[in-house]
């Protein structure tokens, strides 16, 4: 009432109406995304305003691309997207977990319980679940020689939730090998050193790992070689063309001879830089060696002519992000001047060749020694397939990186959620005094949304599945769900593992957002940018 006195145009939802609006919004977003969860999840088709179509089952992509107007749903979506930004996965799980927490809370609130009591129970349950997670995790030793098999299992688990089984299994080796390629002991893993390049060509199963680099342009001279072996590679950021001064300078001449002399001097300056590169080539190259110049700046036609005459391959306008990758892949160093070129500045590659696809040219730099950068070359018959594979590969790379940094994994297939629920009900609930027990119970039951949704998406009976899993856990057996037949399965033997950091972030963020939403007792649309114009 007081808000309406201050602003007659304000829209206000009070107490139970506000609470039920937030709960319904959370449940609505949950219903949209829950069918995507797991290997048996379905695909959503997003149609844009201009008619463009996007096919995806990646929760992060859906939440970013969808137009969400409800404020509660926007808040949940931002939390889920932040989950992906931090840990690389768990977007869909976050949304359905928050939705289930709200759904479980609604039952208690409808029976007269105050939301504050539930929030207190959520906080107790969250702390207990995080402590249980630390005891439940499986340590993985990540020294100089990493356990490649466990990394493959984690990557396979992630990729199978995004792609069909055959392609996911093929990409598993590619993803693991690419992360191990760029990994340096005692240093953080920089996934930007893995170039993800795509070619609209052939089929998705033709996707491969290139231990080197693929540049999305070719040489600009018809006489340059299209294939060369045993290549010395000069990575440089030097202008091999006439360019204007960076300061606002002008030149004046009084006759044509002076102008001609000035043009000749400018040309001579560029030619001298090119000749220094040619001198280095003659110094280091034997009869069977070749020389490649990859320049971030331009190379003009006369300079290309000089290089081509000496059998040098010249690539210009290389992207800035590829300069660091080239040095890591091929060795040597990127130079900003040709004045003091030495053989130590050069990298090496066993094979450099150009591939032409339609009007596009690609240059492959392969057979490098000890690469610390690589390229995942994604192929597919159409843009929809390529976009799906890209999303999956990015999630796969993050899952492998997380495993190496966490040095532990968590049993998947819903095993952790069922075990945590049993722990909360059988151990933690007894230690809680008063009505906060109901908050702990609601939190415990909300954890079951993951195995329930996995079973539902696989076409299984959810009640039978949950009863079967909980009875096994009561016997002391840690089991997950076999999506093929609905029977309990040992995730460790089946090789189904989740990331520890993803689970931890999920348990941390879910109850916090749910608690904030439960404590909303008024929704007021009266902000300055929302106010309706008055006459």
Swiss-Prot record:
Gene3D superfamilies: GroEL, GroEL-like equatorial domain, TCP-1-like chaperonin intermediate domain. InterPro entries: Chap_CCT_zeta, Chaperone_TCP-1, Chaperonin_TCP-1_CS, Cpn60/GroEL/TCP-1, GroEL-like_apical_dom_sf, GROEL-like_equatorial_sf, TCP-1-like_intermed_sf, TCP-1_chaperonin. One of its GO terms (cellular component) is plastid. Pfam families: Cpn60_TCP1. The keyword Chaperone applies. Molecular chaperone; assists the folding of proteins upon ATP hydrolysis. Known to play a role, in vitro, in the folding of actin and tubulin. NCBIfam families: chap_CCT_zeta, thermosome_beta. Heterooligomeric complex of about 850 to 900 kDa that forms two stacked rings, 12 to 16 nm in diameter. This is T-complex protein 1 subunit zeta 2. It comes from Arabidopsis thaliana. The lineage of its organism: Eukaryota, Viridiplantae, Streptophyta, Embryophyta, Tracheophyta.
């Amino acid at each position: 009432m007081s808000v309406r006195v201050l602003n007659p145009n304000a829209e206000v939802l009070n107490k139970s109406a506000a609470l039920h609006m937030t709960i319904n919004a959370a449940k609505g977003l949950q219903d949209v995304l829950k069918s995507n969860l797991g290997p048996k999840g379905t695909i959503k088709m997003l149609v844009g305003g201009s008619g463009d179509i996007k096919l995806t089952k990646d929760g992060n992509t859906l939440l970013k691309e969808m137009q969400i107007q409800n404020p509660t749903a926007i808040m949940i979506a931002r939390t889920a997207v932040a989950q992906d930004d931090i840990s690389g996965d768990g977007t869909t799980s976050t949304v359905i977990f928050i939705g289930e927490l709200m759904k479980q809370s609604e039952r208690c609130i409808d029976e007269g319980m105050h939301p504050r009591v539930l929030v207190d129970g959520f906080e107790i349950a969250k702390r207990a679940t995080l402590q249980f997670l630390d005891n439940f995790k499986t340590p993985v030793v990540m020294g100089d020689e990493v356990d490649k098999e466990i990394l493959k299992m984690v990557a396979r688990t992630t990729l199978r939730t995004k792609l069909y089984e055959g392609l996911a299994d093929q990409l598993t080796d590619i993803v693991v090998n690419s992360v191990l390629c760029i990994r340096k002991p005692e240093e953080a893993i920089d996934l930007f050193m893995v170039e993800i390049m795509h070619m609209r060509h052939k089929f998705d199963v033709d996707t491969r790992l290139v231990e080197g680099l693929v540049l999305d342009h070719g040489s600009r001279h018809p006489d340059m070689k299209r294939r060369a072996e045993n290549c010395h590679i000069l990575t440089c950021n030097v202008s091999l063309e006439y360019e204007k001064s960076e300061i606002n300078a002008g030149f004046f001449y009084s006759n044509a001879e002076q102008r001609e002399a000035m043009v000749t001097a400018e040309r001579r300056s560029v030619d001298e830089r090119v000749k220094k590169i040619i001198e280095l080539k003659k110094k280091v190259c034997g009869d069977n060696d070749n020389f490649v110049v990859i320049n971030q700046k331009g190379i003009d036609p006369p300079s290309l002519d000089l290089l081509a005459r000496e059998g040098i391959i010249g690539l210009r306008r290389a992207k800035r992000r590829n300069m660091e990758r080239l040095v890591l892949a091929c060795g040597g160093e990127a130079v900003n001047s040709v004045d003091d070129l030495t053989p130590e500045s050069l990298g090496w590659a066993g094979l450099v060749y150009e591939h032409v696809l339609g009007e596009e040219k690609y240059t492959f730099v392969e057979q490098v020694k000890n690469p610390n950068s690589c390229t995942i070359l994604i192929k597919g018959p159409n843009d929809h397939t390529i976009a799906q594979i890209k999303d999956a590969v990015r999630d796969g790379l993050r899952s492998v990186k997380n495993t190496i940094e966490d040095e532990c994994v968590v049993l998947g297939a819903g095993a952790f959620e069922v075990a945590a629920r049993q722990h909360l009900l059988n151990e933690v609930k007894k230690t809680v005094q008063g009505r906060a027990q109901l908050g702990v119970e609601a939190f415990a039951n909300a954890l079951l949304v993951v195995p329930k949704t996995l079973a539902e998406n696989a076409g299984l009976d959810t009640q039978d599945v949950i009863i079967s899993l909980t009875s096994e856990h009561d016997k002391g057996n840690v089991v997950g769900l076999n999506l093929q037949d609905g029977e309990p399965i040992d995730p460790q033997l089946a090789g189904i593992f989740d990331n520890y950091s993803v689970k931890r972030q999920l348990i941390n963020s879910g109850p916090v957002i749910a608690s904030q939403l439960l404590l909303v007792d008024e929704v007021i649309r009266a902000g300055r940018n929302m106010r309706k114009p008055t006459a």
